[in-house]
Each structure stands twice: as structure tokens, then as C-alpha cells.
Amino acid sequence: MSGIIATYLIHDDSHNLEKKAEQIALGLTIGSWTHLPHLLQEQLKQHKGNVIHVEELAEHEHTNSYLRKKVKRGIIKIEYPLLNFSPDLPAILTTTFGKLSLDGEVKLIDLTFSDELKKHFPGPKFGIDGIRNLLQVHDRPLLMSIFKGMIGRNIGYLKTQLRDQAIGGVDIVKDDEILFENALTPLTKRIVSGKEVLQSVYETYGHKTLYAVNVTGRTFDLKENAKRAVQAGADILLFNVFAYGLDVLQSLAEDDEIPVPIMAHPAVSGAYSASKLYGISSPLLLGKLLRYAGADFSLFPSPYGSVALEKEEALAISKYLTEDDVFFKKSFSVPSAGIHPGFVPFIIRDFGKDVVINAGGGIHGHPNGAQGGGKAFRTAIDATLQNKPLHEVDDINLHSALQIWGNPSHEVKL
């Protein structure tokens, strides 16, 4: 294979999956085939999309009800020649799912890149090992928290929040994705003030915390804004990838003047991936493509919290982010939304130690504030790695957290 193989879930009311697959393969490449003169067929053969797999799935009543017609469901795979497109994500996505995405009854499940094609993508600049080296933390999951309620607040409020989270043992603190450039907490001021706070905490407590600052603005201003952030001392860039595009992420990741990790936020991605019947699958969008394009971290809804993905999907995202690939470093999985200390054993059981445990309200909502919330999570992480049930741990911060949010993991075994 020298090109790319696209895997689709299709729904066909004509009940002929093979014909539907061939129509897609032709429609996204040379347009027609059977009516072409033999000589022209020979000339265009190398550009033709080829159906390489058709698999019928069981009938699904919910799907029929939603589509208001009886359809045949199937998985098909089509190989697209590398000759047909330039080796970039806009060309790849347009080739494999451009006008087909308007069908409304087709879901792009996966894209399998040839080795030749993979060479054109940067992958994570730091990856899991590089991030761990920055923090000098190698034996446990990382803990991340989020600034909460920052809109309309000043730098003093940010510094207080940041200090409390760092003292609580949080490894990474990230901006809220809806915190943009503003007069009260402008980008460079956030970074400079944040570094002062984190250096003070490190000198006093010996704990290192990194700050992920949200890089925003118009698309053609992003590189300049990212470089300003780097010059001001940014540790990590948070980026709302799907508000801009995967190719924009790749452009930032490939720039040698932006030598910091990039954290991909999934904002807007639900518009592409939420439906089970059409769009682009979450594992492909939030896993494989983000990793290929250069994300060191990928945030996605956890299977446990307030905006839950199905467990199978969440684990598939993580698999794409962390599976061995000679071309790419591994990206950190960051299952998010509604996470509290009682979920820690689930997260470690399902995602392993190479995961970032990300919490907002589960840290800030603690009775002892963000310091207590961070300490509760760190205690839960340590206890889980020792295979000790959380309810048996004698720690006031963890006990308070379990009292508030519960302990659904009391029977979890690693």
C-alpha cells in the first residue's frame, strides 16, 4: 500500500453494499469507470479508488427508526492511491470524506496511512517520555487541573488559583479553553506571573508544576502569538484544534521556533464525531489524527464523568495515542469531564500509568480548597498504585472528597 485506506460505516437503503462501496470509490476518485473507453481506463487505472473489503452488519432497529427507512449496515474499506492527493491532512480528508460527508448516512471510522505517507507528519514533539522528563515524574499518572471562573478576573486571582493548585501537588495547570486574549489577563502577563508563582512554589515545596496557556487569535496570527508565548516562557500551549483545523496544529508543531509541547482541546470536535451514524469517529479524530499532526496531549471525554464517551470509544482513542509506531512518539491520553478522586482507580485500571488525570470541580470544589483537592487526588493515585482501596486510606483530604463525591471504585482491582 502506498496511499491510504479509509474504513467507513455505511447505511444503504438499496441493500447493495458492494454497489454502494464501488460508487463511493469511484465518486471520490475518477468519477466513472464502466463507460470509459478501454484506453482511458488503462490511463486512469492507477488513480482509481479500490474497494478492498465489504462486511455486512446486523440490522439495527434504532438506526432504521432514526433514518425513517430500512437500511443495510456495513463496514467497507477503500484504498485511495497516493497519486491522487498531496500528503497533507486537508487533501487527505477531502479525498476520503469531502463531499461524502454530506451524505448524512456515512461515518468515517478509520484511516490507515502507508509508511510513505506517515513520513510527512511530525507527530508529538515531546511525547509521553519527553513530558515526563520535563517534570521528572516517571512512575505514576500525571495530575492536571484547570483554572475555573477566570473570565472577568484579574491576574491576582489567577496567581492565587495557580499557587493553590501547585501546592496541592498538581503537575500541570491549564487555562480554561474559553479564556481568550483580554485586558485583565493578557497572554504574556499570564505566563510571566504564572512562572513567578510556580518558581516560588518549587523553591518552597520542591514540587514542579507546568502551566498550559491557551494560545488563541485569528488563524494567521497564531504562530506569532505562539512565539510570543514561548518568548515569555510558556511551558505548554493549549490549543482549540478543531476551531481552527488539524493542519493548523501541524503547522504549529512543525515550527522550530515553537519548541514546547502542545495540548489539544476537543472543543468543537463533537460537531464532527458525536453521531453514531455519520461524521468522523472519535478514535480517529481525537486519537490518531491528533497524534500524527503533533499533539503531545489529547483531551477527550472520559467514560465516567459528566460528558461521557462510551468506554470502548475512549479506550480506542487512547490506543491510537499510545500504540507503538516507529514514526511517532506517544501522546498522553487525558480523559476528562466530571472527574473526582473516586474515579482514580477506574482511570488507572483502564488507561494505565501513562495517563493524565484531569480535574476541575473535583479539585476546586474540595472543602479544603484547591490545595486539599490536589492532595486528595495525589493520595488516591498513590493508594491505587499500591492496590490499596481508597476507603482504607487514612487521609483527611481524600476522606472529605469521597464523602462529597462518593467512592464508586471501592471494588476495583488493578
From Swiss-Prot:
It is an enzyme of class 5 (isomerase). Keywords: Amino-acid biosynthesis, Isomerase, Magnesium, Metal-binding, Methionine biosynthesis. The active site is at residue 99. The keyword Metal-binding applies. Its cofactor is Mg(2+). Substrate binds at residues 148, 174-177, 265, 338, 360-361. Its EC number is 5.3.2.5. It catalyses: 5-methylsulfanyl-2,3-dioxopentyl phosphate = 2-hydroxy-5-methylsulfanyl-3-oxopent-1-enyl phosphate. GO terms for biological process: carbon fixation; L-methionine salvage from methylthioadenosine. InterPro entries: Diketo-Methiopentyl-P_enolase (IPR017717), RuBisCO (IPR033966), RuBisCO_lsu_C (IPR000685), RuBisCO_lsu_C_sf (IPR036376), RuBisCO_lsu_fd_N (IPR017443), RuBisCO_lsu_N_sf (IPR036422). GO terms for molecular function: 2,3-diketo-5-methylthiopentyl-1-phosphate enolase activity; magnesium ion binding; ribulose-bisphosphate carboxylase activity. It holds the Pfam family RuBisCO_large_N. Binds 1 Mg(2+) ion per subunit. It comes from the Bacteria. Pathway: Amino-acid biosynthesis; L-methionine biosynthesis via salvage pathway; L-methionine from S-methyl-5-thio-alpha-D-ribose 1-phosphate: step 3/6. The keyword Transmembrane does not apply. Catalyzes the enolization of 2,3-diketo-5-methylthiopentyl-1-phosphate (DK-MTP-1-P) into 2-hydroxy-3-keto-5-methylthiopentenyl-1-phosphate (HK-MTPenyl-1-P). Homodimer. Belongs to the RuBisCO large chain family. Type IV subfamily. PANTHER family: RIBULOSE BISPHOSPHATE CARBOXYLASE (PTHR42704), RIBULOSE BISPHOSPHATE CARBOXYLASE LARGE CHAIN (PTHR42704:SF17). Has no RuBP-carboxylation activity. This is 2,3-diketo-5-methylthiopentyl-1-phosphate enolase. It comes from Bacillus thuringiensis (strain Al Hakam). The gene is mtnW.
